[in-house]
A protein has these predicted regions:
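Non-catalytic cap/lid and distal C-terminal segments of serine-dependent acyl enzymes
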Residues: 25-324
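Beta-rich, blade/repeat-based domains predominating
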Residues: 364-379, 405-424, 428-429, 445-463, ...
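Blade-level signature of beta-propeller repeat domains, shared across WD40, Kelch, NHL, RCC1
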Residues: 588-631
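A short beta-strand motif characteristic of beta-propeller blades
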Residues: 358-364, 398-403, 439-445, 479-486, ...
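Beta-strand-rich domains and repeat architectures in extracellular enzymes and scaffolds
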Residues: 342-347, 359-388
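Bacterial N-terminal signal peptides
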Residues: 7-18
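Short loop/turn segments immediately following beta-strands, especially the blade-tip
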Residues: 517-524, 613-619
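Blade/loop signatures of beta-propeller domains
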Residues: 327, 333-358, 621
């Protein structure tokens, strides 16, 4: 294979992405040779294709986010005939020396085992930060783990459309394949599941079919849905990951059995390796031959046979040790500490809290309680809008009355200027109070309905109007404007800034998806996405999000109907904390507080509660850049 771009780096990896929740070394299994075979070696007399590198500009599906990709074109490509193609997610790894897809294609096309096909190696998008003081937004989980057709539509409507400007690509779905590893395996399958009119041939290696963003629902969905004409090759290993989202070694056979049950053409390769590309790479030639056998005959759905799916489970061998494993035969697993992930695969919630440090009530029971907010000294203020009072809780848990006759003030936030800001819904205005307790109340803005506020270090105030479904901003000069009115957020209820104040997170009290917007230099909201995916209650139609907060690692904490849901930076819900009281009374706010900002405060049923955590909250006057997340 010839590379046309000088210095075009390729990845040689034995393990691409460690699963969240931590990894541990498993007992070594029997030695297995997963070295690359003859199909993966350059062969004498075989024509070499070319590989070029490109950048796809941001588009409508992932706004503000460019994508890098490479295109392999076989030597046998004929511009006069529409060409088949395959798309490889996390493409640099597939194109690199560890997997050698271009070499394998050279050899198999030369032997006429495959039609002359192009290969597209696309990497997940990264939305660049606006400054080096802010963190990028990493789109891999959002792109690959989502069950919606957004990513498939992006591939067809933007990526393939761009490549088709230079090459004659077939528009027949029978000529299209897609492959992915780990989370990319989910992305590959979901793309074909949602758009079988575009993709019919699928490869997933060590697919992350656990409950990250709902992929664990797929087996049941497959069994209940009219079969779709796709052919699927799957691979997993006995020493693959086990974490809060499930067991890879069990979830993959569940998927394969469901596909077999539905009548799909499916094959699963069970091996001894961990979360690695080695096994899949060692059988890539065989995999591609199986996937494209009998081409150009169209892929159809067969009639399920009695007992379909049972044979797959019969291949499973009980493991002596059910531990999270990567087992890279000498390769150390990458550390995830910087991303805030726990040290162990089980009880991952205890990376956030201690099991013996439970919720404690602060103060009495009030007519109402909402809008917890932290000041510089660790004191937490909360509102009783029914009684028109604001209370102050100190670090020791003592509660005193801070203000009376507040005209129903709520949506409390402490600004960088040291004042307490609040929204008075009845009088349609935003006010601020001096924290000294002096009778110093300033009207910040009038004729404004603000259900929640988010304050920046520079003095801008973002507000959300739930009824009008808009987000607005008051800048430091007092200028007011609407920065979101798109209508996609069903019930915008809550706001918070990311730790670096580069993005605004908007809670949706109805939908499961919470929104992430980049804040432009002029304060406008751009590049919005339904980014964080929450779990939904079995009863009721709504997420019930009433408040948002973030910690210094960039995790979002959402007060919701299910409890406190914690989403890691890339948007996956990793943990759910119990509500202080196990009843139907909703949470009404959430905030970090205490002198070290390590206490989590929530309000529920007219009460203020707190508990210690292992995380640190952030404040308006001290933006911090969170670490790059583990993907």
């Amino acid at each position: 294979m010839k590379t046309l771009v000088a210095g075009c780096a390729v990845l040689a990896v034995t393990m691409w992405f460690a699963g969240p929740g931590g990894v541990a070394q498993a007992p070594a299994g029997p030695p297995v040779d997963y070295s690359l075979g003859p199909d993966s070696q350059p062969q004498a007399g075989v024509p070499h294709g070319t590989v070029t590198r490109h950048t796809l500009a941001p588009g409508k599906f992932f706004p503000g986010t460019p994508h890098t990709y490479q295109v392999y074109v076989p030597a046998q490509y004929d511009a006069g005939r529409p060409a088949a193609y395959m798309i490889f997610l996390d493409g640099s790894g597939y194109a690199g020396d560890a997997v050698r897809v271009p070499v394998v294609l050279d050899n198999l096309i030369a032997k006429h085992d495959l039609p002359p096909m192009l290969a597209v190696f696309i990497d997940p998008g990264v939305m660049p930060a606006l400054s080096d003081q802010a963190q990028n937004r990493y789109e891999r989980i959002f792109e690959y783990d989502s069950l919606t057709p957004r990513f498939a539509n992006f591939l067809i409507g933007e990526l393939v459309a761009e490549i088709a400007r230079s090459y004659n690509l077939s528009t027949n779905s029978n000529d299209h394949g897609i492959a992915g590893l780990s989370t990319g395996g989910v992305g590959a399958f979901v793309a074909a599941w949602n758009r079988p009119d575009q993709f019919r041939r699928v490869i997933t290696w060590i697919g992350s079919f656990g409950n990250f963003r709902g992929a664990d629902r797929l087996p049941g969905l497959i069994r209940r849905t009219e079969p779709r004409p796709i052919r699927v090759f799957m691979q997993t290993g006995r020493q693959d990951l086990v974490n809060y989202a499930g067991s890879w070694y069990l979830e993959n056979p569940r998927m394969a059995a469901a596909l077999e049950f539905a009548g799909n053409d499916v094959r699963i390769e069970l091996g001894e390796d961990g979360h690695s590309n080695r096994h899949g790479a060692s059988v890539l030639g065989e995999t591609l031959r199986w996937l494209w056998r009998d081409y150009p005959q169209p892929i159809t759905v067969g009639t399920p046979q009695p007992g379909a799916g049972r044979g797959i489970f019969a291949q499973l061998v009980p493991r002596r040790e059910m531990v999270a494993a990567t087992v890279n035969r000498g390769a150390a697993p990458p550390a995830n500490a910087a991303a805030g992930r726990g040290a162990g695969p089980r009880g991952a919630v205890y990376a956030l809290i201690d099991r013996d440090k439970l919720w404690e009530q602060v103060g009495d029971t009030y007519k109402s309680a909402a809008s917890a907010a932290l000041d510089r000294d660790g004191n937490v203020y909360f509102a009783d809008p029914v009684s028109s009072r604001i209370y102050k809780a100190d670090a020791a848990g003592r509660v005193t009355t801070f203000k009376e006759q507040t005209n129903g003030a709520q949506a409390l936030r402490v600004g960088a200027d040291g004042r307490l800001y609040a929204s008075q819904l009845a009088s349609q205005r935003v006010v601020s109070y001096a924290l000294s307790g002096a009778n110093d109340v300033s009207v910040v803005a009038q004729n404004i309905h603000a259900n929640d506020l988010a304050l920046t270090k520079t003095g801008s105030i973002y507000f959300v109007d739930t009824a009008k479904k808009i987000v607005g901003v008051l800048d430091a000069t007092g200028r007011r404007r609407t920065v979101y009115s798109g209508g996609d957020i069903m019930s915008p209820t809550a706001l918070t800034l990311t730790p670096d104040q580069a993005m605004l997170l908007v809670g949706d009290g109805m939908d499961r998806y919470q929104w992430s917007f980049q804040i432009a230099v002029d304060g406008a909201l751009v590049n919005g996405e339904p980014f964080q995916r929450l779990e939904m209650p079995e009863e009721g139609l709504f997420s019930g999000v009433t408040g948002l907060s973030v910690d210094s690692l960039g995790y979002m904490w959402a007060a919701s109907a299910m409890g406190i849901q914690v989403c890691e930076q890339p948007g996956r819900c990793t943990n759910i904390l119990n509500k202080p009281e196990f009843n139907d009374t909703p949470l009404t706010s959430i905030a970090f507080g205490g002198p070290d900002r390590a206490w989590l405060y929530v309000t529920q049923g007219g009460k203020l509660f707190r508990r210690q955590t292992k995380r640190t909250g952030v404040v308006a006057w001290e933006p911090v850049k969170p670490p790059q997340p583990g993907l």
